[in-house]
Amino acid sequence: MPDVITRFAPSPTGHLHIGGARTALFCWAFARAEAKRRGGDARSTFLLRVEDTDQARSSEQAVAGILEDLAWLNIHWDEGPRIGGTGFQPVAGAQPPTAIGGDARRVGPFFQAQRLAIYNQYIDWMLGHDLAYPAFDTAEQLDAQRKAAADRKHTYRYKRDASYDRDAALARLRAGEPCVIRFNNPDAPVHVADAVLGDITFEPEHIDDFVLRKADGFPTYHFAVVIDDELMGVTHILRGQEHLNNTPRHVALQRALRRADTDQPFRTPVYA
């Protein structure tokens, strides 16, 4: 049987909250239970990844707090930022645990801010296959588009205009003009197989040409999570109900990346 790999990937923009701790516990417990159920040489890995692409709100203090809280809860990750050992005390007076984390499979680094070169490689692949494109809309233009949609009582959905000049846009990108990179959504239904909710179909109008890379050069959550889950070999994704509507974007991206002549298969993990 293949290995089971789960992950918990918090954003260090504040304290670990009860919902995040619950998700981490489920991911940890599922990995441990699957290894026991399968027996023999079956292996499971619970990894911790820090999604710190929001540079304005992320902080080292929040990272330290999240890691210490998880360690205090005895939710110990197999791979991820290494902490513990001599001198580590998650709460006053506590005994330091054995070292937690590491990179046995060499899939790190585990901080997304340290993985920008990796994301840019996949952005380049997608640009080369017209699966992504530069967009130069100003904030005022986007606000006007949203207002026009609201006036028509339509849900706002960004789509590339039929008059879009791809060659000219790529030239502007190469010249260093500030822009975002958007996903060229193929307008096809997306089918999500959820282990808890069953099969769900999302129609094209639920997915727009969402941003993959922001103007500051950092990836969005949607892009980075798909790349990292693939490269880190994540097989099962347990997430809160609030992330259900994000899933079709991720499945659509996985499908597109399978077509982008990359060096990865971009398998769709089990969602629950």
Task: Label every PLM stretch briefly.
Residues 86, 128, 133-270:
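Active-site cores that bind ATP or allylic diphosphates and position pyrophosphate for catalysis
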Residues 1-149, 216, 245-266:
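N-terminal Rossmann-like or analogous alpha/beta NTP/dinucleotide-binding catalytic cores
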